Amino acid sequence: MIGLLLFIACDQTTFRTNFDEEEPAILYQAETKTDAPQTAEQLLVINYNIKYGGARLSFFWECDGERYNMTVEEVTGHLDAIAEFITDADPDILILQEVDRSSLRSNYIDQTQYLLDRTNLNYGAYASQHSVDFLPTDGMGHVDFGNAILSKWPISEATRISLPLVESYPAYYKYLYLKRHVLTAKIDLPWNDHFYAIDTHLEAFSEGNTKLDQITKFHSVLTDLSAEGMDWVAAGDLNSLPKGSDNLKDFPDDCPGMFDVDDYSGEEDWIDPLFNDFNSAMNLTEYAADNEAWYSYTGKAEEGWSRTLDYVFTNGTWVNDGADNMVMQSVEQGGYETIYLSDHAPVQAILEVE
């Protein structure tokens, strides 16, 4: 009762959890910049959910997890490994999810700035999807994490566009819960003054129509940019399986009895409009023939990659009709052993410069 009264007594400035429907995102620059190409025939884009630099530590919301926070050495060690991968892969544009900006669990390290200062990328944009001055549960404390876009070229403007919330949650829970969004960043390419990168991270569970509503809004943002004559590449963790998936539930990395197991039954066609209206980095025919080559997530490294959650789309054209696009799962496929860097694998897509 005391806790409830305390919560009621606090107004939204105490926790500062809310966002406008649209608002400017936070812009970044690397401390020391590297020279960016003035011309190019193609752009290498990588989409990557980096799990807030948590690597394969098991947190309390994961299977058999007990951890709440990381030591400085753990966070910087994990981020340094990710930065090494980014430097070696050398993307022109990097689209990230689950990036901490100022969170107790990662020792308040601004991960967007940290990665900019340790890679060949020069500019960044960040938007929060969970910003709470003090989260009074499970030792979380201060939380600020979200999505980020990093680029070799300047980002002149960036916008956070709110996505629909989970309406079924009680008011107090919804108030402190994640506020998902679409992040758009206008990148000033020397040869193109109307190019955008777009980033999103959708609801992990369907929760009624929430995930479907978020997919619809994401599609609408992309459609509007195309109608305005903008060129774009969009990516994110959509927490959805594509049509042609061999398995929709009973994954080897599930934790029955601990958490609700993942079940995507009935959602198979939810992301069809994205595939129908835009160019996907993943060819659905190839995916249907070999699901495993496009797996990009697993909750347990020892079980191997178990499903496809991460995607890249464009209204442009992929180099070689997308033949060089891939999920960078391993040394054999992508050149890097990424399964220990995060619970998601990076997705590579190569965009033709027209």
Where do the model's predicted regions map?
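Conserved S-adenosyl-L-methionine
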Residues: Y123-S131, A158-P164, A323-Q329
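Short helix-loop capping/hinge motifs at secondary-structure junctions, enriched
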Residues: N120, P154-T159, W318-D321
